[in-house]
């Protein structure tokens, strides 16, 4: 067993002083070690009154400016996932529904120069049920049924059916399908005896073992709940009015537990950013026995520690850029011809800091292509099917509308879909690049693009969901 490390008392006093000094720089915040993307909540509070710069040394951490404030992530700002679609604004016929996302992060802006905390909305049409409920009507009441008992007073019932007319589309008839009333047989019922509750057990001489006696405890009950009637005669209570049992097997007397001393301080739990140091104690002074109560309070306690070292941030790929023009070196005229060219696209690795991991994969892609930009080919084009209805725009403004489209689709030439570039390396796929000129029969007065618009109905208001929480 190794001896515990002796920490000089002066060093401990210095550490406690540093932890209690107020943070400098920006206003202090509540610092958390985890940001939960699925709920936009802060998890695992590290400490209060921490400076924003110290808390965000680790980009995986999060902070709140006040107890009831929004949770904000320390990472570079980016949009949260879209929320689930809210319930439809009406329960039948056509309505609308909203969803949202929030710019989450610190030290920058999301796309479109949106500041952290900004909400962005989407609105779409919805239809929970095509038709609305229609109420039905009741039939006439059936005759009353027989009385439920053969003596004394009971009840009888009668029924009716919801079919005059029948309800439609989930509707119903108002009122009840069955009703009851009292009935009297004019016959007296016998009263059968029933036991009242058992009385309490008599006291044993001791509540825990170790005494000189093994006492017996007894209890009794009476046939009085109710007593049996005499005319007409009722049945007596079955069974016995008394019972007894031995008090043997009483437990040993309990011993309550007590805390031992706090153990030594552990190292800081992290090597970068903010972490914790822990102390522990055991409930062994004495150990609880024979049902005695366990020690109250916590067996661990934590203090915040600051490594003052920023945590690595791995790089992340930006989206691929657009493909370059399809060309072929030393050959200028390949447009509209079955001549294979090449094009490239690139992407940028952003956000890498403090010796974080580089982005995996390549930053450039090359593919083979045919240049068909603004080309006219022999066959006429054809109109596409209607696209799905788009989102309602504006989602939070007045009179939002939705649009669907049909486009004139140009016919593509029957060029070879593959090409052999280097002998022994097999065939490579060839992609069409550019937009050929489309020539379609005129449709509703349009030659290229046909659009249909509709208003969005029963539009709900855009409200921050976090402001609706109690």
From Swiss-Prot:
Transmembrane segments: none annotated. Glycans are attached at residues 82, 85, 138, 141, 144, 150, 195, 198, 201, 207, 259, 262, 271, 320, 323, 383, 386, 389, 429. The keyword Secreted applies. Residues 350-358 are annotated as: Interaction with Complement C3 beta chain. Disulfide bonds join 31-55, 42-71, 56-74, 88-126, 92-132, 103-110, 131-169, 147-183, 151-189, 162-173, 204-247, 208-253, 223-237, 268-305, 272-311, 283-295, 326-369, 336-375, 349-359, 392-456, 396-462, 408-440. It is found in: Secreted. Keywords: Complement alternate pathway, Disulfide bond, Glycoprotein, Immunity, Innate immunity, Repeat, Secreted, Signal. SMART domains: TSP1. Residues 1-26 form the signal peptide. One of its GO terms (cellular component) is extracellular region. Coiled coil: none annotated. GO terms for biological process: complement activation, alternative pathway. Residues 27-75, 76-133, 135-190, 192-254, 256-312, 314-376, 380-463 form the TSP type-1 domain. InterPro entries: CFP_TSR-0, CFP_TSR_C, Compl_asym_regulator, TSP1_rpt, TSP1_rpt_sf. TSP type-1 domain 0 binds to TSP type-1 domain 4, and TSP type-1 domain 1 binds to TSP type-1 domain 6. These interactions mediate multimerization. In plasma, properdin exists as dimers, trimers or tetramers in the relative proportions of 26:54:20. Interacts with the pro-C3-convertase enzyme complex (C3b-Bb) comprised of Complement C3 beta chain (C3b) and the Complement factor B Bb fragment (Bb), where it binds (via its TSP type-1 5 domain) with C3b and Bb. This interaction stabilizes the complex and allows it to become the active C3-convertase enzyme complex (C3b-Bb-FP). Interacts with C3b. Interacts with CFB. A positive regulator of the alternate pathway of complement. It binds to and stabilizes the C3- and C5-convertase enzyme complexes. Inhibits CFI-CFH mediated degradation of Inhibits CFI-CFH mediated degradation of Complement C3 beta chain (C3b). This is Properdin.
């Amino acid at each position: 067993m190794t001896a515990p490390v002796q920490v000089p008392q002066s060093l401990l006093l210095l550490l406690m002083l540093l932890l209690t000094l107020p943070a400098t720089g920006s206003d202090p915040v509540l610092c958390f070690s985890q940001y939960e993307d699925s709920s936009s909540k802060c998890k695992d509070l590290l400490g209060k009154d921490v400076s924003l710069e110290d808390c965000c040394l680790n980009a995986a951490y999060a902070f709140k400016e006040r107890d009831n404030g929004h949770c904000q992530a320390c990472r570079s700002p980016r949009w949260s996932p879209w929320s689930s679609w809210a319930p439809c604004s009406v329960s039948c016929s056509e309505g609308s529904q909203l969803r949202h996302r929030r710019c989450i992060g610190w030290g920058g802006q999301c796309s479109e120069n949106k500041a952290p905390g900004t909400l962005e909305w989407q609105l779409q049409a919805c239809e929970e049920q095509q038709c609305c409920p229609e109420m039905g009507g009741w039939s006439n009441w059936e005759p009353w049924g027989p009385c439920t008992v053969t003596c004394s007073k009971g009840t009888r019932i009668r029924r009716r059916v919801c079919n005059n007319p029948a309800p439609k589309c989930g509707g119903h008839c108002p009122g009840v399908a069955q009703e009851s009333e009292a009935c009297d047989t004019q016959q007296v019922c016998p009263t059968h005896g029933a036991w009242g509750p058992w009385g309490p057990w008599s006291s044993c001489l001791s509540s825990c073992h170790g005494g000189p006696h093994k006492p017996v405890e007894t209890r009794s009950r009476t046939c009085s709940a109710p007593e049996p009637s005499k005319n007409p005669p009722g049945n007596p209570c079955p069974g016995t009015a008394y019972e007894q049992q031995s008090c043997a097997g009483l437990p040993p007397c309990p011993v309550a537990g007590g805390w031992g001393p706090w153990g030594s301080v552990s190292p800081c739990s992290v090597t970068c950013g903010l972490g914790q140091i822990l102390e522990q104690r055991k409930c062994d002074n004495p150990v609880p026995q024979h049902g005695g109560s366990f020690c109250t309070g916590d067996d661990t306690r934590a203090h915040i520690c600051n490594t003052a070292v920023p945590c690595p941030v791995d790089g992340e790929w930006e989206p691929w850029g657009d493909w370059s023009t399809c060309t072929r070196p030393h050959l200028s005229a390949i447009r509209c011809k079955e001549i294979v060219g090449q094009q490239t696209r690139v992407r940028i690795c952003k956000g890498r800091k403090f010796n974080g991991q580089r982005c995996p994969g390549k930053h450039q892609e090359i593919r083979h292509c045919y240049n068909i930009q603004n080309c006219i080919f022999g066959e006429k084009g054809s109109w596409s099917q209607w696209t799905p209805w788009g989102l309602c725009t504006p989602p939070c403004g007045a009179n939002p509308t939705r649009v669907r489209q049909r486009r004139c689709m140009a016919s593509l030439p029957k060029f070879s879909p593959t090409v052999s570039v280097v002998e022994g390396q097999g065939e490579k796929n060839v992609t069409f690049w550019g937009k050929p000129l489309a020539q379609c029969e005129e449709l509703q007065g349009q030659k290229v693009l046909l659009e249909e618009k509709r208003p969005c109905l029963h539009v709900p208001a855009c409200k921050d969901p976090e402001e609706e929480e109690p």
